[in-house]
């Protein structure tokens, strides 16, 4: 029997509060898969696998809507391939579509192409945004259904649910036919979002002394980082969070750097630490963007940094413009260093002070140009010579992946991984979830690895144990295959 709108609204509120009447609601902190976080009370785990995934919420919701007659199958993207029964209708997400409360939102394009993502419309919103109720947005599969404002990225379909006749439903209204994708902006225009994270950082008590310019070692844009991190919670932030994330035309202010610290330099929070003294900004997409696109992302960071330096009364110099590698052993900012000095810290090790100064001086010049002229242009180093950004550049930054007979993608990589706040089950001999268990990698443990693999929906690192065993440890989820794979949130910190 169809539910009334009032009943639907009550159900959604109960999901959000963690009090819904469901046999699949987690009653107390629970964990059976160390690949994910510990599920909190209120999380929905409808199938008993992989903790509280996004689809678990929909499986429970549809069972309730259909009086336990329809149980969904497949991943999130598969929901538009099946029928839930009478009264359910599948709609393509068009420019004129304003969803109604209770509808199911299905994401199948862009970064959601591999498995999809899914949630429930909590507030239909408008053309630009709506409020979604969802699970597993943070990748840890550990939270109860949570509300988040979404911008329609990757959303391809809505599933309309049946509503009992005679109830009041929010009327669909016409909206402008403008594309949900923001129109290209002028080069000098930056959109700055101040959608701060849902955690209060320690206060510095004074303005920052300067800016640390990072490379994100990821594939997301500034806006995508905002979507995934704004409500991620402490467990994710403890693995590292910067004040700002910049890409072409867009900067997300995750934390107000004027008086709050961030965890971006990895050297603690003491009065002399980089975390305490400096603001931090990530140049985004350092592992996925073309050289041309990455340079545009850098320009957004330089322009924004110039604005902040004016606000804070700072002059760009070697004391105020800093590199992550000045505080701890790391290759960051690896992509910028390759482009502007010709030195690759990933393959060549730690650079000399002269090379670091060369990169800092380039950053300083770019920031000064924006402060003095309001504009600047990129230059890169190619074959030892400086050239304009129009010079073709095709340097691979992700290494050469190979595929073995078992379908595992692998490549050599020498680095260090520091586990987060949850133990991880390791495997012996191969990167498969059904391989022999090697034990638990404790929370906070450090391992030095020499190989990276992609298999079974995860990214693994490989290393030799003291007893001679070859051990593989999953360190994040992964969608797709190289070179277009999309890594999930890391379960620790790479150095």
From Swiss-Prot:
Residues 378-398 are annotated as: Disordered. One of its GO terms (molecular function) is metal ion binding. CDD domains: PGRP. Its EC number is 3.4.22.-, 3.5.1.28. It catalyses: Hydrolyzes the link between N-acetylmuramoyl residues and L-amino acid residues in certain cell-wall glycopeptides. InterPro entries: Amidase/PGRP_sf (IPR036505), Amidase_domain (IPR002502), CHAP_dom (IPR007921), Papain-like_cys_pep_sf (IPR038765), SH3-like_bac-type (IPR003646). One of its GO terms (biological process) is peptidoglycan catabolic process. Its cofactor is Zn(2+). Ca(2+) binds at residues 45, 47, 49, 51, 56. Residues 29-160 form the Peptidase C51 domain. The active site is at 54 (for endopeptidase activity), 117 (for endopeptidase activity), 134 (for endopeptidase activity). Pfam families: Amidase_2 (PF01510), CHAP (PF05257), SH3_5 (PF08460). Residues 412-481 form the SH3b domain. Zn(2+) is required for amidase activity. Contains a cysteine-histidine dependent amido-hydrolase/peptidase domain (peptidase C51/CHAP domain) at the N-terminus, a central amidase domain and a SH3b cell wall-binding domain at the C-terminus. The CHAP domain contains a tightly bound structural Ca(2+) ion and it is present at the N-terminus and is associated with the endopeptidase activity. The SH3b domain increases the CHAP domain activity. Belongs to the N-acetylmuramoyl-L-alanine amidase 2 family. This is Endolysin LysGH15. The gene is lysGH15.
């Amino acid at each position: 029997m169809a539910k009334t709108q009032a009943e639907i609204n009550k159900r959604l509120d109960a999901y959000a509060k963690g009090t819904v009447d469901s046999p699949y609601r987690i009653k107390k902190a629970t964990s059976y898969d160390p690949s994910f976080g510990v599920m909190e009370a209120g999380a929905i785990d409808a199938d008993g696998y992989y903790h509280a995934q996004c689809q678990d919420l929909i499986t429970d919701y549809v069972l309730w809507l259909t009086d336990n007659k329809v149980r969904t199958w497949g991943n999130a993207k598969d929901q538009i391939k099946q029928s839930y029964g009478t009264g359910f209708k599948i709609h393509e997400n068009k420019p004129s579509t304003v969803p109604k409360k209770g509808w199911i939102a299905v994401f199948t394009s862009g970064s959601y192409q591999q498995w999809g993502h899914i949630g429930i419309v909590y507030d239909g919103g408008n053309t630009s945004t709506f409020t979604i109720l969802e699970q597993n947005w943070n990748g840890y599969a550990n939270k109860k259904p949570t509300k988040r404002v979404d911008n329609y990225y990757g959303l391809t379909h809505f599933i309309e649910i049946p509503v009992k006749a005679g109830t009041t439903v929010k009327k669909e209204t016409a909206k402008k036919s403008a594309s949900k994708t923001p129109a290209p902006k002028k080069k000098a225009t930056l959109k700055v979002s101040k959608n701060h994270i849902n955690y209060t950082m320690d206060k510095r008590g004074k303005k920052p002394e300067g800016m640390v310019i990072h490379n994100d070692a990821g594939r997301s844009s500034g806006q995508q980082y905002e979507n995934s991190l704004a409500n991620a919670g402490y467990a994710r932030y403890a693995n590292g969070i910067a004040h700002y994330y910049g890409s072409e035309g867009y900067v997300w202010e995750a934390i107000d750097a004027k008086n709050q610290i961030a965890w971006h330099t990895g050297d603690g929070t003491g009065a002399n630490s980089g975390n305490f003294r400096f603001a931090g900004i990530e140049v985004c997409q350092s592992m996925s963007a073309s050289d041309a696109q990455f340079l545009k992302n850098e320009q957004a960071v330089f322009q924004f940094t110039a604005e902040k330096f004016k606000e804070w009364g700072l002059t760009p110099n070697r004391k105020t413009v800093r590199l992550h590698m000045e505080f701890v052993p790391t290759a960051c900012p690896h992509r910028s260093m390759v482009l502007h000095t010709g030195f690759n810290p990933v393959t060549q090790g730690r650079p000399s002070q002269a090379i670091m100064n060369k990169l800092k001086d380039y950053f300083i010049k770019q920031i000064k140009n924006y402060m003095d002229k309001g504009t600047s242009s990129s230059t890169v180093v190619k074959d030892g010579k400086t050239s304009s950004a129009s010079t073709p550049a095709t340097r691979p930054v992700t290494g050469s992946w190979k595929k073995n007979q078992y379908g595992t993608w692998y490549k050599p990589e020498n680095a260090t991984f520091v586990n987060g706040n949850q133990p991880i089950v390791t495997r012996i001999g191969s990167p498969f979830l059904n391989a022999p268990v090697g034990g638990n990698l404790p929370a906070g443990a450090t391992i030095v690895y020499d190989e990276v693999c992609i298999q079974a929906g995860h990214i693994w690192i490989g290393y030799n144990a003291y007893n001679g065993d070859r051990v593989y440890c999953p360190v994040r989820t992964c969608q797709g295959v190289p070179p277009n794979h999309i890594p999930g949130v890391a379960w620790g910190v790479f150095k």
